[in-house]
Amino acid sequence: MKDEQMLTEWPSHLPWLNQSQNDFTFPSDTYLLLYFWSMSCPNCHQLTDKVLQDIKDMNVKVIGVHVPYIEEEKSMEVVLTYALDRGLAIPIVLDQNYEIVTTCHVQGIPSFCLLSQYGQIITKTMGDVGWDKMLKKIAGL
């Protein structure tokens, strides 16, 4: 597969919340689901709790990739406060310069990107309809 269809390492300079990036190396012991979201995204607000509930007992690790809409959302403190207020305990990486977004070819949020244990992009979806499709894909792993 082409390099742009792989995420073989995390950009080392990006800040993480709730966990260290060193806990997520490739190859991984499980599939990884990247959940691209933003504090300013109304659809993300509606979908986040459903995503976390649906995925709870599945063989996949969720990583929230925060995509800033505005400059203020590049602040780790602002995102941390939001995550604490919402009870988001999942690992969150702040993709402040859209590096992971670019690697995964994400075109809008909320979006989902399923990675193999080796960082290969298996499938990508967007929105609530996309979430339903992603659930079916994960259930078939």
UniProtKB/Swiss-Prot annotation:
Gene induction: By Spo0A and PhoP, during nutrient starvation, especially phosphate starvation. Repressed by AbrB during normal growth when nutrients are plentiful, in association with the transcriptional repressor Abh.
Disruption phenotype: When the skfA-skfB-skfC-skfE-skfF-skfG-skfH operon is deleted, increased rate of spore formation; a double operon deletion (sdpA-sdpC plus skfA-skfH) makes spores even faster.
Additional record remark: Accelerated cannibalism by skf- cells is seen on solid media but not in liquid media.
Pfam families linked to this entry: Thioredoxin_8 (PF13905)
GO biological process, one term: bacteriocin biosynthetic process
Organism the protein comes from: Bacillus subtilis (strain 168)
Positions of disulphide bridges: C41-C44
Entry protein name: Thioredoxin-like protein SkfH
Cited Gene3D superfamilies: Glutaredoxin
Keywords for this protein: Antibiotic biosynthesis, Bacteriocin biosynthesis, Disulfide bond, Redox-active center
Residues covered by the Thioredoxin domain: 2-141
SUPFAM superfamilies, A to Z: Thioredoxin-like
Coiled coil segments of this chain: none
Record InterPro entries: Thioredoxin-like_fold, Thioredoxin-like_sf, Thioredoxin_ResA/DsbE_sf
Extent of the signal sequence: none
